Amino acid sequence: MGGEERSGDGEKRGEEVVDAGSLFVLKSKGTWWHCGFHLTTSIVAPALLSLPYAFKFLGWAAGISCLVGGAAVTFYSYTLLSLTLEHHASLGNRYLRFRDMAHHILSPKWGRYYVGPIQMAVCYGVVIANALLGGQCLKAMYLVVQPNGEMKLFEFVIIFGCLLLVLAQFPSFHSLRYINSLSLLLCLLYSASAAAASIYIGKEPNAPEKDYTIVGDPETRVFGIFNAMAIIATTYGNGIIPEIQATISAPVKGKMMKGLCMCYLVVIMTFFTVAITGYWAFGKKANGLIFTNFLNAETNHYFVPTWFIFLVNLFTVLQLSAVAVVYLQPINDILESVISDPTKKEFSIRNVIPRLVVRSLFVVMATIVAAMLPFFGDVNSLLGAFGFIPLDFVLPVVFFNFTFKPSKKSFIFWINTVIAVVFSCLGVIAMVAAVRQIIIDANTYKLFADV
């Protein structure tokens, strides 16, 4: 492979890595365009629709500062992670997974007991959260058509799970390239729609009063600030950069940077427009999902045409399915390594049947959890605090310092150290804030609740 040896968890036979996960799921066949599609799908997701909600705890100045800071730090961190991967590839060891990097750069225990488990928890948490949000969007579409309909949320979660069940059978990360190119278009469509609707509603004579004051007692406001910062950090989160870079064909040098530039162009076009227009229109009344603000709570009628509500929810549902299947790939990689025989063909009966059964089982389990726990968003905040923040803000700079060993007197050493320390502290505080929110909301939790 262009002089680069693909390093996975499996045994090696000469030049061949006997690891079904790397052979079947993490195929290195993509271009930088494909990489850009994968990156955009994993980062520019419907979680961005909660950015106006984060702003209401921060206000204009702090909100925009955090949004700019999140973009700058994650772009920097992802660039360092990519450069670290390219460096090891140039030395003959191409690491395909986050846990492989931790294993070889830090120690085997870091890969096995820390990075691997938290990455899997984050990925599966994203799948569950997307199934729940997909069900909520499907229900919103249903209520547009049948305002007095009696179907419950868990039924729509199951419908979304059926869609995900089909998409989960795509054999490899690379095989998702066309789905993820469509995903890029969808995120532009629902972001532009959300921004346009916010501007339209904000200019209406009967628009909600624009109030940007930050409410609550000092304790609530402090926790609100850290909660909002965690929301923004998680929205920029990825957690699977090495797996995405693994899909690029050799030589990899420079391709990831092009993909990142493409992705962050979309980030700027979507994150900032939705956050600023949504907060401008609704202020402190901004909800966790900006679409819910399009309903006039006093009249129970939408500020915008119902066909518009149907369309933006459709765009969101379709992209949610793409995001979920992207985050299934690291899980599929592990499953494939366990259940498949790398000495057999990828589509042999020996490999296809176990793949179909096990992938379907994991999707069904995620769908059941999403249907049972419609309050999973609180739990997902906790997962984001201890998962996305270390994976995307802390470990990349640590890997870079351990790999390149910059002088302790150099600027890059200290900026990396400061980033690692600051975001480690933010992660701990965000976990405390998430646990506090779970305790506050515990009395409202109900299995299979129709929210």
Curated annotation (Swiss-Prot):
The chain crosses the membrane at residues 35-55, 57-77, 115-135, 153-173, 182-202, 222-242, 262-282, 308-328, 356-376, 382-402, 411-431. Its main location: membrane. Highly expressed in flowers and at lower levels in roots, leaves and stems. The keyword Cell membrane applies. GO terms for biological process: gamma-aminobutyric acid transport. High affinity gamma-aminobutyric acid (GABA) transporter probably involved in GABA uptake into cells. When expressed in a heterologous system (Xenopus oocytes), imports GABA, butylamine, beta- and L-Alanine, 5-aminovaleric acid, 6-aminocaproic acid and 8-aminocaprylic acid, but does not mediate the transport of proline or glycine betaine. This is GABA transporter 1. It comes from Arabidopsis thaliana (Mouse-ear cress). The gene is GAT1.
